[in-house]
Amino acid sequence: MAKKTKKPSNQIAANKKARHEYFIEETYEAGLVLQGWEVKAIRAGKMSITEAYVVFRGNEAFLFGAHIQPLLSSSTHVDPDSIRTRKLLLNRKEIDTLFGAVNQKGYACVPLEVYWKDSLVKCKIGLAKGKKLHDKRKTLKDRDWERDKERGFKQHLD
């Protein structure tokens, strides 16, 4: 029987810090408006969104603080700006929902991951509420407890 080949991951960049710092209430999928050199750099895996966040200006949403390191070979005729503000493509209803929650209810809008969907670059955005220090400690304590519990079951079965 032939071995199954692993399907390559579509994920480009992930914001692991966001799940530690925030409670994620809802997620939305948004498209990214990119330039040609940015797409080539993303294909080479040169993107980071750990310090990125979503900003609303007018009736549009923008990804601010995402870093794309330019390739030397692809951006020779353009002056690349690696921390450029990039427009997010969302429906009007989604923008209104996110904008209302961020302005009134004290929520934040953070990018969770960037990934390929067919040949398009998509960004998963989370509507998030900030965690307090004791919430972060509780999350770590619960994670450790689950790990110890699994270890105990494994030793008990052996």
Swiss-Prot record:
Coarse class of the protein's main subcellular location: cytoplasm
Coiled coil: none
Keywords, in A-Z order: Cytoplasm, RNA-binding
Subcellular location: Cytoplasm
Keyword Cytoplasm part of the UniProt annotation: yes
Source superkingdom: Bacteria
Pfam families documented for this protein: SmpB (PF01668)
PROSITE patterns the record matches: SSRP (PS01317)
A molecular function GO annotation: RNA binding
Entry keyword Repeat: no
GO cellular component: cytosol
GO biological process: trans-translation
Stated family: Belongs to the SmpB family.
Purpose of the protein: Required for rescue of stalled ribosomes mediated by trans-translation. Binds to transfer-messenger RNA (tmRNA), required for stable association of tmRNA with ribosomes. tmRNA and SmpB together mimic tRNA shape, replacing the anticodon stem-loop with SmpB. tmRNA is encoded by the ssrA gene; the 2 termini fold to resemble tRNA(Ala) and it encodes a 'tag peptide', a short internal open reading frame. During trans-translation Ala-aminoacylated tmRNA acts like a tRNA, entering the A-site of stalled ribosomes, displacing the stalled mRNA.
PANTHER family: SSRA-BINDING PROTEIN, TMRNA-BINDING COMPONENT OF TRANS-TRANSLATION TAGGING COMPLEX
HAMAP family in the cross-refs: SmpB
Protein name: SsrA-binding protein
Source organism: Psychrobacter sp. (strain PRwf-1)
